[in-house]
């Protein structure tokens, strides 16, 4: 049995083994974002946040999906083998940070909530400031 722990402060996540109470080394999500992608640079003590997480199993693989608040994105990792976490993909959520019309005049907050159906590949991201929802479907769900 495992648990997924996301750390908003340093922008990382870990897998906790609930039988041995040991955790994997932290994975910093910002390191897997494409060049030029929006990251949180407001403070040196705060990184791009894996805000909300969901876990989905498909064909013997376990995937961790996380909403990245300041990056307006959903990022996916294959965590089937907790000792060998593999970056899978990242997709933009909402209208995009460069076009965010946040009432506060700041575009630093995007994808806040996340919901994933456990079997059909549908994922929803609640985009906080713009008041929208993005629907994703996994490639395997469209096959």
Language-model features: locations:
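Structural signal for beta-propeller blades
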Residues: 11-13, 72-74, 131-133
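Hard-cation-handling environments
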Residues: 1-3, 8-19, 24, 56
């Amino acid at each position: 049995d495992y648990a997924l722990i996301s750390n908003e402060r340093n922008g990382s996540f870990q897998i906790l083994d609930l039988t041995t109470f040991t955790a994997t080394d932290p994975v910093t999500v910002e390191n897997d974002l494409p060049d030029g992608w929006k990251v949180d640079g407001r403070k040196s003590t705060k990184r791009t946040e894996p805000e909300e997480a969901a876990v989905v199993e498909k064909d013997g693989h376990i995937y961790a999906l996380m909403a990245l608040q300041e990056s307006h994105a959903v990022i996916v990792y294959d965590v089937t083998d907790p000792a060998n976490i593999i970056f899978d993909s990242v997709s933009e959520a909402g209208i995009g940070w460069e076009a965010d019309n946040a009432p506060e005049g700041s575009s630093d907050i995007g994808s806040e909530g996340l919901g994933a159906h456990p079997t059909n590949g549908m994922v929803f991201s609640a985009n906080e400031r713009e008041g929208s929802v993005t629907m994703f479907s996994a490639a395997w769900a469209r096959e």
